[in-house]
Curated annotation (Swiss-Prot):
The lineage of its organism: Bacteria, Bacillati, Bacillota, Bacilli, Bacillales. This is Glutamate-1-semialdehyde 2,1-aminomutase 2. Its cofactor is pyridoxal 5'-phosphate. It comes from Bacillus cereus (strain G9842). It holds the Pfam family Aminotran_3. It is an enzyme of class 5 (isomerase). Homodimer. The gene is hemL2. Its main location: cytoplasm. The modification N6-(pyridoxal phosphate)lysine is found at residue 270. Belongs to the class-III pyridoxal-phosphate-dependent aminotransferase family. HemL subfamily. HAMAP family: HemL_aminotrans_3.
Amino acid sequence: MVVKFTKSEALHKEALEHIVGGVNSPSRSFKAVGGGAPVAMERGKGAYFWDVDGNKYIDYLAAYGPIITGHAHPHITKAITTAAENGVLYGTPTALEVKFAKMLKEAMPALDKVRFVNSGTEAVMTTIRVARAYTGRTKIMKFAGCYHGHSDLVLVAAGSGPSTLGTPDSAGVPQSIAQEVITVPFNNVETLKEALDKWGHEVAAILVEPIVGNFGIVEPKPGFLEKVNELVHEAGALVIYDEVITAFRFMYGGAQDLLGVTPDLTALGKVIGGGLPIGAYGGKKEIMEQVAPLGPAYQAGTMAGNPASMASGIACLEVLQQEGLYEKLDELGAMLEKGILEQAAKHNIDITLNRLKGALTVYFTTNTIEDYDAAQDTDGEMFGKFFKLMLQEGVNLAPSKYEAWFLTTEHTKEDIEYTIEAVGRAFAALADSK
């Protein structure tokens, strides 16, 4: 049976007339998987999507991570509805924002103080400003391939070597801004040390995805994050954890709790909103007191702390406090990993699979993936074919070889079993096309 996307194709054609590129985020485009009209979804419930053509999918996109409790979770939708009935925006303090801030602090002890914003991009952008205000320095460091939103300072690629300054990774980012950014490879202590030896006295902070989620799921090598803290603090700079993807995804207390390493500042987003727009940042009291109205680092937002997002976030965290929830995600993730690897061996398809608990990435390569260079050197064309074969099987993935598969609390063993069978059929088709 061939799945038809007639209405999605027509809708995309219309969208191209009104929306830039036909999408509101480039990651939704099918450009990276061979082109064509992206599938337009009409509704989601639990672990499933239905598109505008009526096709049903098991969803592993999970909105790029936030939908850990599945689509339209009743506890969360009830909280959002109640908040909406009471007014979606006040422009004043509320009891909800205080309650939610306390919940975040209890979950992540590194957060002495918290401030809400509207997105992960805003959260990261502001932690950089706060770090600069606190240290009096201007440069930042980041790891190659790690995505920290779309503000100018983080859209910077590596220069010609670890001891050179960055180059713009997007049109519209001035070279003068790129000169404030040093990019080094993830999981490589020596290049980090080399860069800090040269530039450390000018560095305000380093941005760290403690578990990488933006060139697939890549864990830090044992001792790497501890060494990052040591070297960066020796240079007088701060450590910022970008936990926009990782917080509440792998463990209730985030990657910093799972790995036992504490940053100075933390940026949050995605999961904490329960599906609504949100961001937050926090950290040590003496650093956060740089933020207005207490300090000179200005940050504000009309929509920040809005009642709907606060209510949704509180409800989401209440669901995530259920006993055994993360163990279930890990169990299902292990089952899916085992099945995919068995199907790859059966059909002689070369893959490397990285998994941590309820998230995984399938790379079409035989190489170990520990940094961005290795992730780049994988077969994107093969992934594009696999992606479209899986759509035909009723399995929805992110349209990029760099993205993760995210499990939700609503996936079942039957969903995993079907997915493994679908992977087998897709791998068989790929093997036949070689």
